[in-house]
Amino acid sequence: MGLEERLPGGILLSTVEKVAGYVRKGSLWPATFGLACCAIEMMATAGPRFDISRFGMERFSATPRQADLMIVAGRVSQKMAPVLRQIYDQMAEPKWVLAMGVCASSGGMFNNYAVVQGVDHVVPVDIYLPGCPPRPEMLLHAILKLHDKIQQMPLGVNREEAIREAERAALAVTPTIELKGLLR
């Protein structure tokens, strides 16, 4: 069944936001920020068995100025946090962040002064991917979920307000090291 059969009268109705979302999700260029063992699984995802290129991501960018997706794979030390933020700030809009692994998401088993307890304390995170380390299939699933999120993202002023709100929410979260609960 071709496109002609799906479109009544050959007319396609859509909005600019939906078309832009469709185009953006098919051409993500990730900037790798591999810091630990999760980076090995991220590299395996780019191999021939899992083939991330079928989602338009065949090129991992070494420079942040050409990337629009940052995959933070592994734990982030306190000394690496300013570098991570600088790389994020150098990325062009629109940009998205995927926290890959439990260490990037919440600090993992490294609950000490030297490790940031979650990348969301440094940059706003769009997708959290749990696991130690997460399998390549899980990374592909997270990328597909990010595609769904990109498809629904607003454009222009609405997007800028959504980004500011996400940044405020991320900065307002209580750091994990200060939380009280069963383990403290």
UniProtKB/Swiss-Prot annotation:
Binds 1 [4Fe-4S] cluster. Its EC number is 7.1.1.-. It comes from the Bacteria. It catalyses: a quinone + NADH + 5 H(+)(in) = a quinol + NAD(+) + 4 H(+)(out). Pfam families: Oxidored_q6. Belongs to the complex I 20 kDa subunit family. This is NADH-quinone oxidoreductase subunit B. It comes from Mycolicibacterium vanbaalenii (strain DSM 7251 / JCM 13017 / BCRC 16820 / KCTC 9966 / NRRL B-24157 / PYR-1) (Mycobacterium vanbaalenii). The lineage of its organism: Bacteria, Bacillati, Actinomycetota, Actinomycetes, Mycobacteriales.
